[in-house]
Design a protein with these regions (language model features):
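Beta-loop-alpha module in the N-terminal Rossmann-like domain of NAD(P)-dependent dehydrogenases
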Residues: 1-34, 38-52
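A short helix->loop->beta-strand "cap" motif at the edges of active sites that frequently abuts
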Residues: 29-31, 55-59, 162
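Short glycine/proline- and charge-enriched loop/turn segments
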Residues: 30, 102-109, 206-211
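Hydrophobic residues in well-ordered beta-strands that form the structural core
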Residues: 35-36, 60-62, 189
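Rossmann-fold dehydrogenase core element
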Residues: 48-65, 84-91
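Predominantly a Rossmann-like dinucleotide-binding segment in NAD(P)-dependent oxidoreductases
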Residues: 66-145
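Contiguous beta-strand/loop segments that form the cofactor/metal-binding neighborhood of enzyme cores
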Residues: 123-196
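C-terminal glycine/acidic-rich active-site capping loop/insertion
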Residues: 179-221
Length: 221
């Protein structure tokens, strides 16, 4: 099997509830780990995984591929040139309900919007602020029948009084975007978290009562 094979890295695409077990097994076999998001479903689980990777001198990367799309490099450039002092981040990611038999609705397998969807705008806010949160205040709407969260709203406080506002859900009109509000301008994305390799996307700069569109050519992230 993969654990015993002559490999340098193992990609773990199992349900979230199984990530801890197999990430640790991979690390203990001396293999680097590429683990699907969310890498785990609890803080304690994350600590166990990181400890195992450190003890076995291997690396782990959470597979949030959107980070490698070139639009985000361009966004950072625009922030430095046009927005100046960043104040707030607003991230939205949601879509209509998946089928009832979809793994996202299975709480025993790590389902729920917080694990499956909220991780995207949360990750984006950390990339934009280039810092880690100080505190989080959130509310989750649960599907009582399935015992999983179907929508999440959160306010995340970062150092230097920066704040990220996050909304995500399984019961929404499709949206995949974020905006950054700065002292001199605002920037918004057209499609932030799921851009197909053959699709172009756009960034919109709001400044001096004008909106400028910056097109980003297709890219394989």
């Amino acid at each position: 099997d993969a654990i015993n094979a002559d490999l340098d890295l193992i990609y773990i695409s199992l349900p979230i509830s199984m990530h801890e077990e197999w990430s640790i097994k991979a690390a203990e076999s001396g293999k680097h780990v590429l683990c699907e998001k969310s890498s785990t479903d609890s803080f304690n689980s994350a600590k166990k995984i990181l400890k195992s990777c450190k003890n076995n001198n291997v690396r782990i990367l959470e597979a949030l591929a959107f980070r490698f799309h070139p639009q985000h490099t361009k966004i950072k450039q625009i922030i430095n040139d046009e927005l100046k002092e960043i104040q707030n981040f607003y991230g939205i990611f949601g879509f209509p309900p998946p089928p009832q038999n979809d793994i996202r609705w299975n709480n025993k397998l790590g389902g729920g919007v917080l694990n499956d969807v909220s991780c995207y705008p949360i990750c984006a806010s950390r990339l934009i602020f280039q810092n880690e949160p100080i505190s989080v205040s959130s509310n989750l709407e649960f599907d009582k029948k399935l015992s999983v969260d179907k929508s999440t709203n959160a306010s995340i406080l970062f150092p230097n009084d920066k704040t990220a506002f996050i909304s995500s859900g399984f019961n929404n009109y499709y949206q995949s975007k974020y905006s950054v509000w700065g002292s001199d301008a605002k920037i918004t994305t057209k499609r932030a978290y799921s851009v197909s390799r053959d699709s172009e996307t756009s960034i919109f700069l709001h400044k001096n009562d004008e909106i400028s569109e910056i097109k980003i050519t297709p890219a394989d992230q």
